[in-house]
Amino acid sequence: MALRCINNLEIFLRRCTAPTLHRCCVASSRTAHTASSSKGSGGDNSKDQENNGQNKSGYRRFGWRSVFQFCVPFSLGALVSAVLIEGHRDELTPTISARSLKGRRNEFNFIADVVAGCGDSVVYIEIKDTRHFDYFSGQPITASNGSGFVIEQNGLILTNAHVVINKPHTMVQVRLSDGRTFPATIEDVDQTSDLATLRIHVSGLPVMKLGKSSTLRSGEWVVALGSPLALSNTVTAGVISATQRASQELGLRNRDINYLQTDAAITFGNSGGPLVNLDGEAIGVNSMKVTAGISFAIPIDYVKVFLERAAERRKKGSAHKTGYPVKRYMGITMLTLTPDILFELKSRSQNMPNNLMHGVLVWKVIVGSPAHSGGLQPGDIVTHINKKEIKNSSDVYDALAEGRKDLEIVILRGVKQMHVKITPEDP
């Protein structure tokens, strides 16, 4: 700042010296000429020349003196001001600094803390088709997949029943979070509650803690862990939307369960995985998804009852390894369209027919299954089977139980009505 002021002062002096000096000299010359005229013109030329010399030296002294008398105080004042301003620049200029965000990651990363505490107990479940093999590897192809979690160190795993049963000519494999893979056997199944346990022959596994679903509140944070679309170790988060969603509201007439509803992102492959609270405890088993933001989990309190009964059967030596009834295999996971679910679907999609009042939503089709071969796709709505109106999932099971070789199915795909033919596999 001081250097800038000195430069400006030098420029000012250069500009003002010549014109100012010229004006001062002209003024002095005129004054001297007037004085000599008043004394008369009788003087000789030598005296006039002397006077003229004196006047010239006089106006020179008068011009430079005027310039420096004006400029020196000004320059000194400007220089002092510049020094003072430069020395107090920090005081004159307000300091604005961004608010420090350091430490926020550790303070608010509660989701990461949950995953770190219980994520190792979550497993990926694959159902291998023993009749079809990969061309390059020669290994059985994957017919379907799901999730589960370890509940005992000696290899007991909890999952959904629909993940592992009603799939003939298949075998079950479990992949742990560390990448190890083991064959698994089905120990206990409850198709009514859609729960099952698997066993792998390994010990010392990390175990998921089981919490209490009865203490949950709507709006409470939860974390869904699993393997959606075969992507292992996937984490999504959301809140509990409802704690008492009756199975009748979902069209599941053969079940007496009050489901947990959550908006945590859940999709195909999440089935059987844990829904965890912020204490790292499983408070539900992810079971089904209706649409984005609407998913359901089986409450862990209901699961505990199933596990207690299964433990009693194992003590008596009557575990259900093969004792569950095997139905004709179609290869879909479905959900009854209740009025509430229909309203939600219509509000979220413009492709839903306004006159649709009931039906069954196909939300998963197993690759290579009869349904897949027949042309069914996720999102299709089944309205009729063999010319009979379908109002809920029980009607589909009844159609399978009739034993007819082929099923003539009418579906809605968006707003378009279509016909497909499926030949279910016998057990």
Swiss-Prot record:
Question: Where is it located?
Answer: Mitochondrion intermembrane space; Mitochondrion membrane
List the keywords (alphabetical): Apoptosis, Hydrolase, Membrane, Mitochondrion, Protease, Serine protease, Transit peptide, Transmembrane, Transmembrane helix, Zymogen
Q: Per the database record, which ranges form the PDZ domain?
A: 330-415
Q: Where is this motif: IAP-binding?
A: 78-81
Q: How does it sit in the membrane?
A: Single-pass membrane protein
**SMART domains, alphabetically?**
PDZ
Q: Which EC class is the enzyme in? A: hydrolase
Stretch list, region Disordered: 33-57
Official protein name in the record: Serine protease HTRA2, mitochondrial
Annotated source species: Drosophila persimilis
Gene that codes for this?
A: HtrA2
